[in-house]
């Protein structure tokens, strides 16, 4: 498996996102090709590909953002295809995000994970992420 940074929105990548996103959250509407292009243009979309087939087996989005307190990083939408879970794809994607965060010299790298995603939570703890004693609040515009 290899990890690469997506440089352009292609139909092949869009199809992969449409296949993977429901595995993370079936309620989310997959992006259009133009929206995927916006993600690629403004964030770092990492793509894990199978060595033999070249097919997309996982993705993660690495986000850098500056606030008054400094530069922070975020990991979003880590999605590993069910057919390859437990084979290190998620770990490789998150480690790549961590390496990029180190290179950018962020104050912290944040991510969230639902409690029922037990394997993912174990992975994040094993990689050195610690649970913050805070509440996460979400507001959805109508």
State what each model feature region is.
Residues 2-70, 76, 94-95, 100, ...:
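Acetyl-CoA-dependent GNAT
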Residues 65-67, 83, 116, 142:
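Short coil/turn motifs at secondary-structure junctions
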Residues 78-80, 113:
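Hydrophobic adenine-recognition pocket in adenosine-nucleotide-binding enzymes
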Residues 80, 86-99, 122, 126:
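Conserved acetyl-CoA-binding loop-helix of GNAT-fold acetyltransferases
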Residues 91, 115-133, 138-139:
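Conserved active-site alpha-helix within GNAT-family acetyltransferase domains
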Residues 101-113:
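Conserved GNAT acetyl-CoA-binding A-motif
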């Amino acid at each position: 498996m290899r990890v690469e940074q997506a440089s352009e929105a292609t139909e092949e990548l869009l199809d992969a996102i449409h296949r993977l996103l429901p595995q993370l959250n079936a309620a989310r509407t997959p992006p259009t090709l133009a929206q995927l292009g916006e993600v690629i243009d403004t964030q770092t979309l990492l793509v894990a590909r199978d060595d033999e087939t070249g097919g997309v087996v996982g993705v993660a989005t690495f986000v850098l953002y500056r606030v008054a307190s400094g530069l922070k990083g975020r990991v979003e939408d880590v999605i590993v295809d069910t057919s390859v879970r437990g084979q290190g794809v998620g770990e490789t994607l998150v480690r790549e995000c961590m390496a990029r965060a180190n290179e950018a010299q962020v104050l912290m790298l944040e991510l969230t994970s639902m409690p029922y995603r037990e394997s993912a939570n174990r992975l994040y703890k094993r990689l050195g992420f610690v649970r913050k004693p805070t509440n996460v609040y979400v507001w959805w515009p109508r």
